[in-house]
Amino acid sequence: FLPLLFGAISHLL
């Protein structure tokens, strides 16, 4: 589920 978390962070950034 790491990629999903990174995706969320990227969206916030």
Swiss-Prot record:
Domain of life: Eukaryota
Modified residues (Leucine amide): 13
Tissue: Expressed by the skin glands.
Protein's cellular compartments: Secreted
A biological process term (GO) from this entry: defense response to bacterium
Role of this protein: Antimicrobial peptide. Active against the Gram-positive bacteria S.aureus FDA209P (MIC=44.3 ug/ml) and B.subtilis ATCC 6633 (MIC>64 ug/ml), but not active against the Gram-negative bacterium E.coli or the fungus C.albicans.
Assigned protein family: Belongs to the frog skin active peptide (FSAP) family. Temporin subfamily.
Source species: Sylvirana guentheri (Gunther's frog)
Record keywords: Amidation, Amphibian defense peptide, Antibiotic, Antimicrobial, Secreted
Keyword Secreted: yes
GO CC entries: extracellular region
The protein, known as: Temporin-GH
